[in-house]
Structures are given as structure tokens and as C-alpha cells.
Amino acid sequence: LFLKDTFSIAELVIYSIALAVGVIPEAMPLVTTFSLSLGAQKLAKKKVIVKRLSAIEDLGGIQILCTDKTGTITENRLSVVNVFSPNKEETLLYGLMAASSLNGEGTSNNSFDLAIMNAMGSKAKSVVNKIKKINQIPFNPSRRRNSVLIESSYGREIIVRGATEAVLPFTENQYGEDSELARWIVAEGELGRRVIAIAKKRFSKDTYNVSDEESKLVFVGAISFEDPIKSTTKRAIQKARELGVTTKIITGDSAEVAVAVGMKIGIAENTGEVITGEMLFSLLKNEQKEVVKKLNVFARVSPEQKHNLIKLLQEDYEVGFLGEGINDGPALKAAGVSIVVDNASDVSREVADIILLKHDLKVIVDGIEQGRKIFINVTNYVKATLASNFGNFYAMAFVTLIIDYLPMLPIQILLVNLLSDFPMLSIATDNVDRKNILNPKSYDIKELIYLTTILGLVSTVFDFAMFRVFSSYGERTLHTYWFMGSILTELMLIYSIRTKEWFFKIKTLPSKAMLLLTVLASFLTVYIPFTTFGAEVFKFTYPTRDKLLIIFFIVVGYFASTEFVKRIWYRFMNDAH
């Protein structure tokens, strides 16, 4: 145009800037932030606090969800079920005296302590009053036991309590695999019950160390505990499976207990579908990958092994990990999405992306679903805005070269941008068809570029059609009807890209915000050219019925063509995959 001396440099610069503003999806950061904020608000109502907004979208992309079983899969409400001992009362008594977290008032926050206290009833508090705790070595995941040095009416004793394999090897009597105790432990474990062993030792000194608790212990008894599966767990795991997410249990419990729970909730089919952390990491790297892909239950996993297991999974999958202990920090950092419960350690809460106020697997699965909806809506916004903007840009840039006037004035381009942007923003609120969220999603930039380019070319074809029809009527007529056609075709595209199926087959209705804003934008698009304001400020001509009818048929033709091209594209992509 400048070369033809049709316009000054200033006019050309203003037009170019307006055209550039029209083609750039400047609202994308706003749409993304708004979508994520909306998702965070919805999750907050379900007792999920999002620390990192983008974690919601990441949550939607996870393929594997790793969790401990206690408190998430189960109720974390232990009850004593069985006692292996000739003297049940003595075993419970020593089990309670070994409670390292028991305070002077006879209360504790340890679920094992609470279960034993409930089993003992009113006797529990009198036990606490009769003992004097002198020293203790707390429980830790590597030892899998704790011990206390107490003074009571029995004298001064070390009492050791913990996992059976962490206590029994240090007792005076050795219990082999064929012993009655060993068979009892296996039987209880196969029922999903957690078993702890209790042993004691006379001791005269005021202080002791680990070596003192590792010899000449006298076996007192073993207690089995039941932790009921949450009523929501099986449905949550089934829903996760429907979303293409595999749930894996990583626990410090025995293999028997872990796989029994796994079988109850449907992630393991038989007792052989479990492996311990030690067994897993004794394998070669390629064997480890095969095992973690195949199995969903991992038992006797130490904090270090848990970290290595998450890293191993993260190499091939998007992983979400739910942890809570102080030792879970490294594993939480290794996971793509780190999730903790509200009473987790400070270290775990610090590195977490998401905090659960409700200890329930269901809320995590709800979060995955919400993340996928956000991903779909953000992707739909990108498709709609790039396809329509590029389509208009191609057409205007080309037409500008062959006519002696601007196909649309800069102020008209900005009005197109304004009226189409608000409905585009409403995509963030749209309802997503359930069929579209059934698999983990990730951005495919190549597909986005190809699809938006193809849809942009469809838009360009219909822009040329409008130019061909209305350019013969003069400059203002072309401006007016191209303005109308540009906005109305963009609005129709919003509804087309909502689904990969035919538009009329989608069962989920658009959001109220989308319906309201598209109807309002459509009304203003048609109404403004009829007004004096439209004529004076935007230089529109008064529309006529016959030309409005032409615009109507062009818009309908555009929508039908877009639907047809879209279906061919997705069918081609499905065949390619």
C-alpha cells in the first residue's frame, strides 16, 4: 500500500499494529490463570488446598498415583483384633508400656497406642500412672521398631515393640518359618492385618543403646490390628482407572498386609503381586522398570527406596505422590505432583504442591478430573483464538495488497478483538464432556499448529467469500459486513472446538457464562452497525435485510465446513495413532 502511495506511513503503521493486536492471543495468560484459579476454588470446596496453581494442570496429566495406604486407603483407625500370647492381658500391658508417644495424662496420637488403650479399657490409665519412663529410642523407618527403658512394679526393663522381623531375630527363642507364631503372623497378614511383636529384657542401667535391645530379648507376644478400608476408596480407584490413572501403594508394612489391602481395593489380583523395596532394588535397572510397570503394591519400602522408586517411575510416566512423613521430602521432590495431608511434617508441607484437608483418595481423583478439564479448556481457547485470528490475518493481509483501501479500519479491528475476546475468555468456565477427560493429557504443539493452521485456512476461505460478495458495494459496506462475519464466525468456532465429535453429538451443555457472552457478543455485533454511534465512530453503513441474509448463510456454511474439516482431522489423527 505504501509503495502504491495509497496511504501514509503513519496510517500503515496504525493498521499494522491493529492487525498485530488482533492476531496475538493476548488473553491466553488471563485465560490460563483464570482457569487455574477457578479450579483451585472448586478444589478448595472439596478440602484441597493448591499451593502452586499450575500443579492443578499437572495433576490432570498424571498417569500414576503413588500413595501410602494408612489414612488414605484405610481409615487409620486401628483396633486390636487378635493377640498371640499365652497371656493376652500381659501382652497388651507391655504393648502399652512400650508406647514412646504416651504422655503423663494417658493420651497419645499414635494409632497403635490408641488401639491398645481401647482394648484395655479403664485399665489403661492406671498402667500409665504406675510406670516411670527413664529413656527411649524412638521408632524410625530403617529400624522399624522403638524401645523404652521403664521402671515399674516389675522392676527396670527395656521393652521393644515393632515389626515382627525387626524384633523376633533378637529374642532368645528363635521362631522359624514353620513355627506356630510364624504361621499366625502370615495368616493375620493375609487378612490385611498389621502385626507388631513385643519383647522385654531386664536392665539395670539408666541409659542404653541400640545394641542393648538386639540381644537376649524375651518374647512377650504379638498383636494384630485391623485398619478398615475407607468406604470411598474402591470407587475412587475405579474412577482413577477410568481416567487412565494407575494407583500404586508404597508402604512400610509387610508384603502380606500390603497385598491383602491391594486385593481388597482391586489393584492386585493375587498374593504374588507384591514386591519389597529390598527385592526391587536388588534387580538390574531394566528389570526394575519392568517390575514397577507390572506391579501396583510395594511393601517394606524405606524412605530412600521410596525416593528411588518415584524417580524410577518418573522416568517413563507422570507421577503424583502422596506423602506425609519427614522422610518423604526427597520422594515428594522427585514426583511431578507432590501431595501431602494437612498434618504432614513441616518439611513435607514445604515441598508439596497440594495439601489435602481431607484424608481421602477421592479428593485427589477429583483433582485429577479438574486438572484435565482445565487442560481441555485452555487447549480449546488456544485452538479457537489462533484459528480465527490467523484466518482473519491471512485474509486481511492478502486483500490489503489487491485493493486501494483498507479491508477493515484499525478501530474496527480493535472492536472485533474486543467483542470476540470476552466470549473466548468464557471458554475457561466451559463444561467439558466426560469422554474428553478419560485419558491423561499433554500439550502436542505440532498438532496444535497443524490444526489451527488448517482451521485458519477454512476461515480465510470464507473471509475471501465475504470480500468477493461485498467489495463491489463499496468500502463502508465491505467494512460493515466483514466486521459482522469475522465476529460471528469466531463465535461459531468456539462451539465447534468444544468436542472432537460432531457438534450435535455432544451431551454436555456449554457453561452459562459462555452462552451469555456469545449471545451478547452476537447481539452487539449485529446491533452496533444499526446505531448512529456505529456509523459515526466506527464508520459502518446501515445493514440491509438481503445482505444480513448473505452473512447468515456464510456463517452457517463456515460452521458446517469447520465441523467437516475437524472430523476429518481427528479421524486422520486417530488412524495415525
Regions found by a protein language model. Give the residues of each.
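Helix-interface capping motifs at the ends of transmembrane segments in multi-pass membrane proteins
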Residues: 1-24, 41-47, 390-412, 463-477, ...
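Hydrophobic alpha-helical transmembrane segments
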Residues: 1-64, 223, 240, 311, ...
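Juxtamembrane helix-loop transition segments at the membrane interface in multi-pass membrane proteins
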Residues: 9-12, 32-54, 78-80, 357, ...
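Membrane-interface segments at loop-to-transmembrane junctions
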Residues: 16-20, 51-59, 373-384, 414, ...
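Cytosolic catalytic regions of ATP/NTP-dependent phosphoryl-transfer enzymes
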Residues: 58-219, 225, 238-239, 247, ...
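Membrane-embedded transport module
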Residues: 108, 265, 269-320, 325, ...
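C-terminal transmembrane module of polytopic membrane proteins
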Residues: 484-577
